[in-house]
Amino acid sequence: MKITKKKIAWGIVLLILIVGGVICKIRWKVWFHNIPEIRYVLTEDPQRVFLTFGNDGELSRNVSWVCGGVSKQAKLEYTKIGSGDTLLVDGSSKFLRTLGGFGYANWAKFKELSYGDSYSYRVWNDDRSSDWYSFTMQPDSTDHFSFVFIGDVQDTLRGKTRGFMENVRHRYPQADFYMFAGDFAERPMNCYWDEAYQSVDSIATTKPLFVSPGNHEYVKGLVRVLEKRFAYVFSYLLESRYKNNNVYSIDYNDATIITLDSNRDPWFLFSQREWLEKTLKASKKKWKIVMLHHPVYSIKGKTNNLAVRWMFDGLFREYGVDLVLQGHEHNYARMTNKNDEGEMTTPLYLVSHASPKSYRLSFNDKYDRFGTNHRFYQHIDVTGDTLRMQAYLENDSLYDDVRIVKNASGTQIIDNAKDIPEILEMPARLSGKKAEEFERNAEKWRNRSLVK
């Protein structure tokens, strides 16, 4: 009997090893393979200038840039337009060597900015400067602000995102800032950072960018690590990290805005949850907005992203988060929480992307609306008691329109998109049985919507 038990035990171990080996072989590239970086040489001129938020409240701004491996002294020069006074501030530099090359990451902080004022600035490395850029600070008001939200960008080299983003910029010149839900670059490589910057260069120097880490910004391995360039580009992370988690929050106008890092291995999410609860509990703002890369409720499979859901979703509901902005799954989807009467309430969960790649979609009954095979952008306007989220296709057609109204009588969600047809086109990447399955499920969803 003892021999039999041992054989059974060894058989189970062998089976686990075989199954594990098969899974590792199938998923090897996804989990462990990092594409070699193309060789590059950075010039000594300051380049890839990004304006971001800082770490000292809504009036704080940082600027980051890169240059070659010879320059050392980083400085920020700026002036309040019309004042005639120019300030020169010492910046910080970090020499970074990657598999493709090397150079300096630089960053600096603006000081004593004022509500409503406009500033011109340029950055220096030794005796080389960038062009002059300018930006305007928000007015001293808690009644109104707006921003643009973009899901994954993740474009190829010489891609189409630049035209897409230029169009968004011209449509919403008064947007206070831009939020990106990760996968800002296709890969953590210099050539893709160049591509990402060129896609947003006219925005990046004039509006604060607020970016969550995505899985494409990570280096794969047994323990995934955020590629070191990311935190020096979005330098607010250098001071906001919590127990090695790349998290950040800012109180802006009458909102607390939070970004999480959903790419971390599950054991890191415990400390993120701890930080998130402290941040939400401390917030006295009317609106609470959270951004993370992976959808809390996946639209690729009901069991996807379970650790993210278990760690964060209960806190979103307990502390009254209004809007959850997500990416990763390369389709459009909008979900609202439901109260005991089945009425829509917060949080409002939004999944979106602006990448040329569209993935398969698993229709989840928890969601209210889907969209496939298009690129999307969202404009969020907060005025008084109302937060309005409008989603658009790449051709500027209105695709979704939802209002969250918060007043003394409670929170109400108004769906203004009921008469806008859903677009459930076949993603170009699907074929064969997967394509047939998509069509069947899409038809079921359409019929479900008709019944509702």
Describe each PLM feature range.
Residues 2-149, 373, 382-385, 390-452:
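Acidic, histidine-bearing metal-coordination/catalytic regions of metal-dependent phosphoesterases
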Residues 109, 118-136, 190-284, 311-312, ...:
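Extended active-site neighborhood of metal-dependent phosphoesterases/phosphodiesterases
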Residues 149-151, 177-183, 208-215, 260-261, ...:
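Active-site neighborhood of phospho(di)ester-bond hydrolases with catalytic His/Asp-centered motifs
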Residues 159-160, 189-192, 270, 300-304:
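Short, solvent-exposed loop/turn segments at secondary-structure boundaries
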Residues 144-145, 176, 247, 254-255, ...:
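Alpha/beta-hydrolase fold active-site loops
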Residues 100-101, 282-284, 288-298, 351-357, ...:
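Active-site-proximal loop/helix segment associated with metal-binding centers of metalloenzymes
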Residues 283-324, 344-345, 360:
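Active-site-proximal segments of metal-dependent phosphoesterases and phosphodiesterases across multiple
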Residues 128-181, 186:
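An acidic-aromatic substrate-binding cleft motif
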